[in-house]
Amino acid sequence: MNNIIYKNIIAFHPGFYIEEILDDLAMTQEEFAKRLDVSAKTISKLVNAQIPLSNDLASRISSMLGINVETLINLQKTYELKLIEIEKEKKIDAQIEIVKEIDYNYFVKNQILNVAKSASDKIQNLCAFLKVSDLTLLRKPDLLASFRTSVQTVTERNIINANVWLQTAINFGLQKQVKPFDENKLKLAVPEIRKMTLMQPQEFLPKLEQLFEECGVAFVLLPSLKNCGVNGVVKWYDDKVVLAINDRNSFADTFWFSIFHEIGHVFQKKKTKIIINDKVLSQTSQDLESDADRYARDILLPQKEYETLLDSCSNGVTYDKICWFANRMGIHPGIVIGRLQHDGVIPFSRFTKMREKYQIIM
């Protein structure tokens, strides 16, 4: 077939025009081939769009018919450009379902992307921003890097939005100028970071970002993305590391646990490791995740100290005891409450009002 039609796009192969010329000349393909001094098979393949119009063949046809050779060569170029246009349109159609799964308003609201009038515009904007040729690639769990999620059953929608959020975090992280990664400096900074749990976001965020910058960590804090499920990610780039978290659960204790969890992953130095969920993890990844969890728990509330609190609460947990312990540990009471709730010592409904919440506004 020497012409391809898709929607309102038509791609005419040069063979289409050669076939029309032969009809006008009342000439067979065999006779045309003889006059060009090429095989009849070559003309047959050309007319049937099985081969492109070569420069040599265009030159022969130009001499025989008195047609400008550039005109003939442009027929092939135009055909190829139309094919690209058709393939691009097909890809856009295939991506319509993907873009429906993504909250595009997230990017508009956070002034990351411009308002898009159509699904096609959304696709083009997202592809350029996410550095992918096709949004269907977002279905791949291993497209970027492994990520940590609290979603129990991971769906395709979760994978798509996790990849979207991850690339967004990476984009912001790569824009940050930080010093070369210094593991010792980061280890020394951990106690200072822990003290920030007693501060308000407007006070600790600039300090936290600057401290990370000195250690070679590009710290990214983003609002959570609908259907994402990702809590945080660590990704290495040469001599710096991107560490990103979001406000998916909004509670301050979850925020700080995520910070130290991701710092734990930084110290593991597994430069391509990402965790999706327990059901699909290898044992190695489970070990890495458990190790990062342990690290975060012990930094925030060392186990031995935590056990003294539990012993003192044998007759019941009171808010006064929580505040006493938090003051002793130099940490926000909400972090103690969150740990007690997580461990099942107290129900999630108890003292929840005492757990501070953060909201990320870009």
Regions found by a protein language model. Give the residues of each.
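Active-site hotspot residues in diverse enzymes, especially metal/ion-binding acidic/histidine motifs
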Residues: 1-362
